[in-house]
Amino acid sequence: MTKNLLVELGLEELPAYVVTPSEKQLGEKMAAFLKENRLSFEAIQTFSTPRRLAVRVTGLSDKQSDLTEDFKGPAKKIALDSDGNFTKAAQGFVRGKGLTVEDIEFREIKGEEYVYVTKEEVGQSVEAIVPGVVDVLKSLTFPVSMHWAGNSFEYIRPVHTLTVLLDEQEFDLDFLDIKGSRVSRGHRFLGKETKIQSALSYEEDLRKQFVIADPCEREQMIVDQIKEIEAKHGVHIEIDADLLNEVLNLVEYPTAFMGSFDAKYLEVPEEVLVTSMKEHQRYFVVRDQDGKLLPNFISVRNGNAERLKNVIKGNEKVLVARLEDGEFFWREDQKLVISDLVEKLNNVTFHEKIGSLREHMIRTGQITVLLAEKAGLSVDETVDLARAAAIYKFDLLTGMVGEFDELQGIMGEKYTLLAGETPAVAAAIREHYMPTSAEGELPESKVGAVLAIADKLDTILSFFSVGLIPSGSNDPYALRRATQGVVRILDAFGWHIAMDELIDSLYALKFDSLTYENKAEVMDFIKARVDKMMGSTPKDIKEAVLAGSNFVVADMLEAASALVEVSKEEDFKPSVESLSRAFNLAEKAEGVATVDSALFENDQEKALAEAVETLVLSGPASQQLKQLFALSPVIDAFFENTMVMAEDQAVRQNRLAILSQLTKKAAKFACFNQINTK
C-alpha cells in the first residue's frame, strides 16, 4: 500500500530570484532523502510562491525495503588462534557490526579465507522515517540568510508555519522554533489561515484562499491573461522569459492588466523607456504589430480584479515619475561636452589600488593599438578604434547613466551620434561591454570587438597585478566573465591571436600608472576559461590541447573538436600511442635539439627525420590531425628498429633530437601524451 507525503514551509516573502532555485533544491534533496532511507515512490512534485516552499511525494512506499549487507573481515589466519578460537580481532569486528561470533562464516578469495558476516535490517514504517524531513529543510542552502527574534539560528527568511502530512495524518514536528500543524496561510490580503485536509488536497485547499501553489499554473495564468489582453487590444506584448519568471515569483494570485502613459515620453530613447518598465517596475513592454513601442505597459497584480482601476492608476503614477526622470536626463545630457566628461574621469576611481577610470582608458587605448594590427583592422577601422578608445567611458558621468546604470554604453552610443561621431565609434562604445553574461550577445563590429577585448584585458591584468585574484566561487570584480568574454570574442571572429604572445606583448608595455605582474597566473586563468568553452570534451583531451604550444583560441577549440571526432576511429589509439611515446622520450633531450644525419645508423631513423623535417601542419584541425596520424607507421618503425637510449651519447642525443623536433611540431596541435588510450 502506498501513501502520499506533503511538506510545506511557510515563510516571510522570499526574494524572487531565490524562489525557483530553492523549490528545485527542495525536490532534489527530498528525493535523495527518500533514496537514502530506502523508500520508493512514484513521483515528486514541488510547489512555491513568495511565501512558501513545498514538496509532495505520491505513491510513497509504506515501509522501507529490507536491507541485507555482507561485510568482509580479517583473514581466517588472523581471526582464529592456534586453538581454533576467535581472536580479539574477529570479536571486535563482529561487535562493531552489532553481531556475534556465531554469525561468522568463512569465504575464500583468491586462495585465502576471510571472515564474512551478513547483517539484515528489517525496514521501518514510513511513519518512523517522516520526521527526518526536518533535516531536509535544514539542509537547504541559500545565497543569503538572516537571524530573527534574537534566535541563534539563521535561514533565508523567518519561518511561520510547517505542515507535514502523510495522507491525512498530521506530524507535529519542530523546525526553527515552529511547531508543525496542518495550518497554512492563505493570500496575505484576500485569504486567511486554512487547514490542509490531506496531502492530495493541498492545491485546492490553498486555491480557496487565493493562493496558486503550483508555479507552472501561475505562469500559465499570467501568459493566458497577457494573450487575452493582446487579442482584445490588437497589440503585441513582449513576454520576456526572465521577467516572467521573476513576476510569477512575486505573486500568489496573479491578475494581469494594461496601463498607459503619455505618448510624449516616446520621444525619449526606447531603451530608457524599456529599462524603466522592465528593470525598475517589472512591467511587460507593449508594441504594435509592426514592433513600434506603444505608450502602454502590462503589469501583474498580486490579487484579483477587484478595484483594478485604482491599481492601474497607482502603477501609472509610479511609472510616470520614472519617465519624467528619463526625459529630464535625456534633455540635460545633450548639453554636456564629451571631452569635458572624459577629463572628469580622472577624478573617478576605477579601483583604489589601481587608479582612475581615465588611467584605465589610457591603458586600454595602448592595448588597442597592439590588437588592431594583430586583428588586421583597416586604416579607417583603426582610426575609429582610436577615437572610441579615447572617449568610451564618458557616459558614466551623464545623468541618465547615473540614474539608469543598465544603460551604460547604450547611452554612450546615442550621445556620440548626436555629437557627430561616426556610427562605428558610437557602436564600439555600446559593444565594448559585450558580452554581459556567459552566453550574452557578442560585438558585431571589428572595432567594437577589439575595444571590448582591450578593455577586458586591462581590467584582468590590472586586478591581477595588485593581487585581487578570484578564488573559489568568489569573483567580486567579474574577472571570470571578462576573461570568458575575451575568449568568446576571439573565437567568434576567428582571429589568430596567440594569447601567450599577446600577454607577453602587454607585459612589455611600460605604463606609468601600473606595472603588470602575475603573468603565469593570468595565463592559467585564461586557460581555465578556454577549458570551460570546450564544454563536455573529455578531460584528457582538454588537458592535451591546453598543454600544447598553440594558444590561439579558435585553433585550440577546433583541435579539441577534431580529437573528439576521431577518438572512436580504429587508428586513433595506435596513432596517439605512437605520438605519446615520442613525447615521453623527447623530454629527455638535452639542450637545443639539432639532428646530424651523419649519426644515423639505420634507414628508419633517417625516414623519421626526413618526415619530421618536411612536416608542415596546415589547413583545418582535422587535416592537421591526419598529417600527424600519417606519421604513426614511420614512428613505429623507428621504435622497432632503433634503440633510442643508445650508449653512445652523441647517437642518443641525435635520436632524441629527432623526437624533440617531431613533438615540437605536434605540440602546436596538442601534447598527445596527455591523452588516455586505455
UniProtKB/Swiss-Prot annotation:
As for subcellular location, the record says: Cytoplasm
Q: Which Pfam families does UniProt cross-reference here?
A: DALR_1 (PF05746), tRNA_synt_2f (PF02092)
InterPro entries with a match to the protein in the record: DALR_anticod-bd (IPR008909), Gly-tRNA-synth_bsu (IPR015944), Gly-tRNA-synth_heterodimer (IPR006194)
Which keywords does UniProt give here?
Aminoacyl-tRNA synthetase, ATP-binding, Cytoplasm, Ligase, Nucleotide-binding, Protein biosynthesis
What domain of life does the UniProt record list for this protein's source? Answer: Bacteria
Please give the chief subcellular localization of this protein.
cytoplasm
Catalytic reactions on record: tRNA(Gly) + glycine + ATP = glycyl-tRNA(Gly) + AMP + diphosphate
**For this chain's UniProt record, which GO biological process terms are given?**
arginyl-tRNA aminoacylation; glycyl-tRNA aminoacylation
Its Enzyme Commission number? 6.1.1.14
Q: Cellular component per GO?
A: cytosol
GO molecular-function term, one example from the UniProt record: ATP binding
Q: Which NCBIfam families match?
A: glyS
Family membership, please give it.
Belongs to the class-II aminoacyl-tRNA synthetase family.
What is its quaternary makeup? Tetramer of two alpha and two beta subunits.
Entry protein name:
Glycine--tRNA ligase beta subunit
Source species: Streptococcus pneumoniae (strain Taiwan19F-14)
Q: Which gene is the coding source of this polypeptide chain?
A: glyS
